[in-house]
Amino acid sequence: MHCQLGGQARALIFLMFESCRNSWHVSPWSSVPFLPSPCLFFSFSALPFLHPLSQLIACRGSSATWLFPVSSGTLVLRYALAASPPRGTMRPSTNPRTAEEGRPWLIHATQTGPQTASVLSLFPAVNAGFFSACRQHRGGRPPCLLNHRRLLLGLVSVLTVFLSCLPFTNATVSPAALQDVCYAFGNISRKLSSFLVPSRVTCPRGATPLSGVEAQDSLEHPEIPDFRFLVYDVKNGEGFHLQKEVIYRVALVISLLNARSAQQGRMTDVHTAEKAREDRGHPQASHMLCASSSFSHACSARSTFPFFPMWVLVLPPWCRLAHWHFSEETITAMAENSWLKHVRWGTFFDFQDLGERLPVMEYEDFLTYQLMRPDPWGERRQRKEKQTTPVELDVVLSVRFSSTPSSRSLPFCACLSSRASEIADEQAQRDDVCCNVNDLPGCPQIHAALTPQERQRAPAQRGGDPREEIDEQTGEFNEGHNPSGDGEREKRKPGRRSDTSRSRKEIQEEAKVSDTWSGVSLWLAGFCETVRALEMWCASLYIADAPRIADLLWRSVAERPPGAIQTVWLKFGENLLVPWPDVLLDAHLLDMLHVHPKLRQIGDLFINKFLSNRDKTETGKGERASTEGGTEGDENLAKHGYIAAHLRRTDFLYLKRSVPLQRAAAYLVSRMKEHGVFKAFICTDGSEDEKRELRDAVRRVGDAASSSPYTVVFFDLPTVRRLMIKTLEASSHVSDDGSFHDLKAVETPGYSGPNHISLLLHPGITALIEVWIAARAAYFIGTKDSRFSQAIRWERHLMGHPLDSSLEVFCVDSSPDQTGGQAQGKCFATKSHDPPEGRSRSELRRKYWPSLDPSSTL
């Protein structure tokens, strides 16, 4: 029943037979978004990121038989044998002879990307026809199923073998056929639609129907919100790798929400079928099962929330990040290349593979979609004042830790939907409220991210903030805490009354100056831009993990009217607890971020040129095998002939957490001698003088220890650029949308387009290439408590390197207590939230090393 097909394949198969033998019926699938009803009963669709069901679910009664064989990461076949549909329900535009002769017919249509695939003729007994559109059946007898078990089981067997061998390729479509398709929201809308089911070929409301299809037979837009978007960010000052780490936490929230949405949708389907059976006088089924990825239970099928949309993760933009220091050359290049100023996620990582794990989109695409898409609920809000910010979201959510007894005892948390005055009265009488709605004084994290204009308006309208005051002479704000809320407050000026001495009743009385809540304007992390939120939720949880955040969002959104909440902004996403690797592995999210292939290509080029111990003749023969095959055991690790280390300087020097360079040189020579290599690749943010000092120290220590020359290698940008210009026969260019395009003859005179050379000017790009080079080393030594070192260890674990080759860190001093453990002169990082050893061989590893034998082990 399962067929593993390509990741981009989106197939939709409908099986219908015109012979009706008895009263077996199929209820319409009307409650699931993007599925036209009632003519589409079961589909063959790609849902690798939902994984809502973990077993075969069979709901069989006297009037319906449903089979749901579901497996995460595979394409699922859902089939139905039905009688001829009522008139007007289904309209095949080709092969009319099939319907006239009463022969069975099979409609097979595929859609890959923005193009509609051509229709295939499968075999003589079953003709293929292009399926145009469906319209909801308003009356008449529903289609029925055949009651032949042998035919049903035989068909399943035939389809299993047939579909496993069927070549699904990207079919081409003629321009005339493409003109017949009405595009609702452009490429972005079709991409979003492909997350759930194959993109619908429909017209937007008020537009011209499909060519050759009458208006009454065209598919109408469902009057439900198709998607909900979750935007997240982190506090200002965090680096690249923390933002990369937070995506795993928020992605798990998205996965849980979509799994719950799919489960509720199927429960509603079962309820619809049971109600139809009761109306026909049939008894209820004795036993039915519903299941999710974590549990199975009897279907109560009495859901009160009628809509089950798809949740989409919106990746935050890369703005001002710590440790990203732009050179003068980079600043000059930014003025000429706009794409270099705001590099997208698709430039750093393989965005196509990421999209196969969960619904995800870039922040820029999200803004475009928000401006283009029509509101299915009409004008939800009548704004009296002109919108002053380019982006407006429905809700901003902030989550913080709370150890109060009420937070520990509450089984769940939900942000209630009420007017601000009612919420204030309720909070004054109750102590177990876990979420404050539109209560700015009670949410210091949100208050710290206010824009200057919003801060001037906040004290007058909502009673000020107890953690901030205004200088009476300069008018500037004296902030008393950082946005994450975990820092110490600054000392307040003498002569001023501390707002903390004011009672909450006084603050609430001043808050009543403003009759209505008009939203709040906040900075997107890194001061990217101003975003306005129409509603504010501030939740206090004892355990802020992904399941509880997903449950909070589900309950809070379901408590409001349909369509009221479509965009949610998770402020300070780093406050979410880090999920265990086993949980991410079971959710197929552990290895969802692949370093972009072009960046890996640059890293492999650097390794083969500067870090390989092979001679020139061997290098010429095995360069391709090394680049594609990677580390195929200890022998290939030795071929690379280098170890790697991360030496963090700058801020760690002031914190006295950086190892002296002379001691670091002794460490490096000792480890190179231990592993039989003579080169060490060093990742560091130190100055050129520090690099020169370390190189000289390694040479001196190496000469004293052995006659072999020990050297260290740095990722020198000018050297790499000269290497690329000299060796790359074809350069890959980066377009404005962040995607790569191969282009010949990059040295063409007069050409000024962006290429790999200009791409290397970005500090984030070079840092990610260094991570890749260090991850492929035979051994790695990191810096304790550094996110950069942790990112390298993460990549190494996923590649299959043993843990003992990645956990060592530089000993800052001789005390083992400050380094997490010391044995035989070595210090080790704390084993915390690392991928489980023994389960590290994942899809990421197979993606990086396609020629690796799955049966081999490191």
UniProtKB/Swiss-Prot annotation:
Provide the site residues for: Essential for catalytic activity: E795
Q: Which GO terms describe its molecular function?
A: peptide-O-fucosyltransferase activity
Enumerate the Lumenal topological stretches: 172-858
* Spans annotated as Disordered: 448-510, 819-858
Q: What happens when the gene is disrupted?
A: Loss of MIC2 O-fucosylation. Nuclear O-fucosylation is normal. MIC2 protein levels are decreased by 50 percent. Abnormal MIC2 accumulation in the early/mid-secretory pathway. The number of plaques caused by tachyzoite infection of human foreskin fibroblasts (HFF) is reduced by 40 percent. The number of tachyzoites that are attached to or invaded the host HFFs is reduced. Egress from the HFFs is also partially impaired. However, another study shows that loss of POFUT2 only leads to a small decrease in MIC2 protein levels and has no effect on MIC2 trafficking and interaction with M2AP.
The UniProt keyword set, sorted, is: Carbohydrate metabolism, Endoplasmic reticulum, Fucose metabolism, Glycosyltransferase, Membrane, Signal-anchor, Transferase, Transmembrane, Transmembrane helix
Gene3D superfamilies xrefs? 3.40.50.11340, 3.40.50.11350
Q: Tell me how this protein sits in the membrane.
A: Single-pass type II membrane protein
Q: What gene is it encoded by?
A: POFUT2
Into which EC class is this enzyme placed? transferase
Instruction: Offer one example of a GO biological process linked to this entry.
Output: fucose metabolic process
Question: What EC identifiers does the entry list?
Answer: 2.4.1.221
* PANTHER family per the UniProt record, alphabetical: GDP-FUCOSE PROTEIN O-FUCOSYLTRANSFERASE 2 (PTHR13398:SF0)
* Active-site residues (renumbered): E238 (proton acceptor)
Bias kind Basic and acidic residues: ranges: 486-510, 831-846
This protein's name: GDP-fucose protein O-fucosyltransferase 2
